[in-house]
Amino acid sequence: MEQRLAEFRAARKRAGLVAEPSASSQSTQTSGEKAEAATTPKAPSGWLKRFLVWKPRPPSAQAQPSLAQGAAWPRGLESQPPWSPAEEAPPPPQPPPPQPLTPRDRSLLTSVTLLKVLLWLVLLGLFVELEFGLAYFVLSLFYWMYVGMRGPEEKMQGEKSAYSVFNPGCEAIQGSLTAEQLERELHLRPLPRR
C-alpha cells in the first residue's frame, strides 16, 4: 500500500512539473491583450445564474484522506471525505458601501419609475378594453417580481431595497440572521436524518 502511495505522489509531482511550463507559456500575453482583458466589462450575474453555476472547490480545500480513513470508508466513498466545518472557504471580501445618490440621479430614477408605472397603467387600460386585463395584470406581476428580486450586483449603486421601507437605516435587528448566515445554515449543514 505504501508503494502505491509513493507511486501516486511521484506521478502527481511529475504532472505538476509538466503543467508549470504550459502555464508559464500562457502567461506571456501581449500588453494589448492584457489591456483588452482589463477593460472588458463583466456581465452582471442574475439570480438565476447564481443557482445554475457550479463552482468546484479549489484543490487546496480538498483534503487527501489518510490510509486509516481510506480503510474505514465503505467502497465507493473513498473519493468523498466527510464534511467538516474546518474546510469552509473564507467569506468573500465585502464590497465598499454604495455612494448616496445625488439629487439629479434621484430625480432621474424617480421620473423613470413614474414613467414605468404610467406606461403600465395605460397598457392595463388598453388590455381591459380588449378584455385581456386580468391576463396582462398577472403577467406584469412577474416583471415587477423580477425587478424586486434582482441580486445586489444588478442594482444601481445607491438604490434602496424594499426592506429599507420598514427599516429606514437598514440597521441590524438583534437576534436576526444575515443573508450570509442563513445561506450557510441552509447549504452547508448536513441534512437531518429521519
Curated annotation (Swiss-Prot):
One of its GO terms (biological process) is rescue of stalled ribosome. GO terms for molecular function: UFM1-modified protein reader activity. The keyword Membrane applies. Residues 22-32 have a biased composition (Polar residues). Residues 1-43, 58-104 are annotated as: Disordered. The keyword rRNA processing does not apply. Pfam families: SAYSvFN (PF10260). Residues 82-101 have a biased composition (Pro residues). Residues 117-137 dip into the membrane without crossing it. GO terms for cellular component: cytoplasmic vesicle membrane; endoplasmic reticulum; endoplasmic reticulum membrane. Its main location: endoplasmic reticulum. It is found in: Endoplasmic reticulum membrane; Cytoplasmic vesicle membrane. InterPro entries: SAYSD1, SAYSvFN_dom. Residues 1-10 have a biased composition (Basic and acidic residues). Residues 1-116, 138-194 are cytoplasmic. Residues 102-116 are annotated as: Middle helical (MH). Keywords: Cytoplasmic vesicle, Endoplasmic reticulum, Membrane. Associates (via N-terminus) with ribosomes. The middle helical (MH) region recognizes and binds ufmylated ribosomes. Belongs to the SAYSD1 family. Ufmylation 'reader' component of a translocation-associated quality control pathway, a mechanism that takes place when a ribosome has stalled during translation, and which is required to degrade clogged substrates. Specifically recognizes and binds ufmylated ribosomes when a ribosome has stalled, promoting the transport of stalled nascent chain via the TRAPP complex to lysosomes for degradation. This is SAYSvFN domain-containing protein 1. The gene is SAYSD1.
